[in-house]
């Protein structure tokens, strides 16, 4: 028993007792079945940088297997301004290593980030993920260095203005 895995804050890592990089479709299905997960979310970035979400209510095992295997079709022309309507059939396929239990969902929900693929099953060359991957490889080839970056997450709390906690706008990036 590996204590690092058992004590991991990612509930899937603790339950499956393996690191995220080793998650398989069967692992995800087992976690969903044994933990009462009722919804699966596929999350993917659009051209505007916003994270889009597809929600799937899990009503049977065949459906779960189908969405985990084949992903879901999305309209690329509504996601990216450079994709023409005539060639806009894209698929979002889940990356199992990104699976996490959504702490904000009202019903038990498992979320995963997705990759874009074209109608022929090939990675979408112009997707943000693939473009970054190609840039990292080129950077490494030219410099011999490895490119590492982390995203900046921003959360917004939207509620009626009650004037209870007034703040002055400081116009600084630290705020």
Regions found by a protein language model. Give the residues of each.
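ATP/Mg2+-dependent ligation/transfer catalytic cores
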Residues: 1-174
